[in-house]
Amino acid sequence: MSDTTLLPEASFQAGTQGPGTPTGTPVLLGEGLTKRFKQGGLDVEVLRGVDVRVDAGEKVAIVGASGSGKSTLLHVLGGLDNPDAGRVALLGKPFTALREKQRNIVRNRSLGFVYQFHHLLPEFTALDNVAMPMRIRGLSEPAARAEAQAVLERVGLGGRSKHRPGELSGGERQRVAIARALVGKPACVLADEPTGNLDDHTAGGVYDLMLELSRTLGTSFVIVTHDLDLAGRCDRVLRLRDGHLHQER
């Protein structure tokens, strides 16, 4: 089976808008996002009043030079870091202002994350790695594993679910990471250089998979990448430069 082969949806279907979310409400909205860091005794402002909107099912690429603040922006949008100014709304509801415990709950239910390095736990099987967010959510082990198996089938790894990360190829490990990001049926997946550690052929297959899953499941993706060819396949391309986002396409 190729890296881009998807199996039938079966019981797995991601949700984009939660109950009570008005039609047309952006999945993710950042307004006036500002972030500063101390560097060499100086305040460095990496985000300067950034505005960004992501709609349901939309694929948005963020490009820019190394150190321009792309990962910082992704962390702020995902509630992993707090902005110095501005706010983030998730599914039309305040996200930045939530207390950390409540924000963690909302993040677990509405967002997925994929990183350059897969961050899979080496002692656990692919199935148990993917099931972990559902166990954190409070599902029983059998129920969490059933959800995990369904999404592994969706990414073409149903037959590899009992393998540990060390027994999988680089592309397979990243597909497991994508499955883990999707198992909770998030409205949006935030991906930080998800193909950065892969060769060109494998990277292309993983990228194809993410775009196809976005199309078939209606999940929004925000993808930070240095690969302009891959970025060009998204619905929009935004460039982060001098702390501001500029729309390139």
Curated annotation (Swiss-Prot):
Location of the protein in the cell: Cell inner membrane
EC numbers for this chain: 7.6.2.-
Matching SMART domains: AAA (SM00382)
Gene Ontology biological process: lipoprotein localization to outer membrane; protein localization to outer membrane
Region (Disordered): 1-23
GO cellular component: plasma membrane
InterPro entries tied to this protein: AAA+_ATPase, ABC_transporter-like_ATP-bd, ABC_transporter-like_CS, ABC_transpr_LolD-like, MacB-like_ATP-bd, P-loop_NTPase
Gene Ontology molecular-function annotations: ATP binding; ATP hydrolysis activity; transmembrane transporter activity
Pfam families to which the protein is assigned, alphabetical: ABC_tran
Entry keyword annotation includes Cell inner membrane: yes
Binding residue positions for ATP: 64-71
Keyword list, A-Z: ATP-binding, Cell inner membrane, Cell membrane, Membrane, Nucleotide-binding, Translocase, Transport
Keyword Membrane: yes
Membrane topology designation: Peripheral membrane protein
PROSITE patterns associated with the record: ABC_TRANSPORTER_1 (PS00211), ABC_TRANSPORTER_2 (PS50893), LOLD (PS51244)
Domain named ABC transporter: residues: 28-249
Subunit structure and binding partners: The complex is composed of two ATP-binding proteins (LolD) and two transmembrane proteins (LolC and LolE).
Family affiliation: Belongs to the ABC transporter superfamily. Lipoprotein translocase (TC 3.A.1.125) family.
Function of the protein: Part of the ABC transporter complex LolCDE involved in the translocation of mature outer membrane-directed lipoproteins, from the inner membrane to the periplasmic chaperone, LolA. Responsible for the formation of the LolA-lipoprotein complex in an ATP-dependent manner.
Protein's name according to its UniProt entry: Lipoprotein-releasing system ATP-binding protein LolD
Upper classification of the organism: Bacteria, Pseudomonadati, Pseudomonadota, Betaproteobacteria, Burkholderiales
Gene: lolD
